Amino acid sequence: MPLLKSTFLPSLPFRNGHFNTIYRPLFMKEGHNYKRKRINTWDNDFLDLDFSTIGSNTLVIALHGLEGSSKSNYIVSLVNHLNSLQIDCVAVNFRGCSGEDNNHLHSYNSGKTDDVSLIINHILITKKNKYFSLLFDVNFIFS
């Protein structure tokens, strides 16, 4: 595959990688007020889904990366932005990531798709929306 030359040049402060690292946390809105919904899993455990709804007929399912949660800066930023565009969101907290210990010792990994299937089925049954999914750092296993 040939390499393409890009003509993109970010504005001056964003050309520095260190600036990019500290910019978002310094200027981001603090946290987000979610409405948490706990769903039971097939193995007597649970998953916590954090909803941020504004009454839209479109719902984005945001899946965090390893060591992330619905409180991760990139998820909060995404949810705030999508809500400003009149789009409802559900931020998924995979096992062991919601701030509360799960019932079983095993946690999630990028190859574990049954929890995502459970989440999607739960949302399809309980919500009447158009759906989109966004993925972060999960090795594209769900694509």
List the predicted regions and their residue ranges.
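Short N-terminal helix/helix-N-cap motif within the alpha/beta-hydrolase-1
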Residues: 70-72, 99
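Short beta-strand element of the alpha/beta-hydrolase
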Residues: 57-65
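Short amphipathic alpha-helix adjacent to the substrate-entry channel of hydrolases
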Residues: 74-91
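Catalytic nucleophile-loop/oxyanion-hole region of alpha/beta-hydrolase
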Residues: 81, 95-132
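Basic nucleic-acid-binding interfaces
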Residues: 92-93, 143
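Serine-hydrolase catalytic-loop signature spanning alpha/beta hydrolases and amidase-signature enzymes
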Residues: 65-70, 89
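N-terminal cap/lid segment of alpha/beta-hydrolase-fold proteins
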Residues: 16-54
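Glycine-rich nucleophile elbow surrounding the catalytic serine of serine-hydrolase chemistry
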Residues: 133-143
